[in-house]
Amino acid sequence: MKLSTTINFFTYEDDGSYSAYYYDLEHYAKLGFSHLDSIFCSADAPFSPLWTNHYEDWAHKIRKKADELGITFVQTHVPFYNFCDLKKGVNENTEEIVRRSIVCTNILGAHWTVSHPGTA
């Protein structure tokens, strides 16, 4: 069994600025965690790197830092919404962020991603 904990890369300050995920990775490594579950559920927030054309570079930087610290990503959680709600329908922007989250999952080296469709 691999003991792991969860890291949310998309934590924002009250002013909308983005928290430094490097510090979180270092913090978990110092606590002795070498396996992480990554949360992408807030990846559609306004300042998310997933809204940029450089989101893959961002994921590669995280992977590099994690590798330096001996951390592996076990799984991720992609953003979700209730696409079954006939009043809301499919949200193309959220669908793109889900797709980008899956691309980042691959870059991070996680073999699984979790989604909760229809439960939001």
What are these regions (language model features)?
Residues M1-H111:
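N-terminal pre-domain/capping segments
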Residues H116-A120:
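Active-site-proximal loop/short-helix segments
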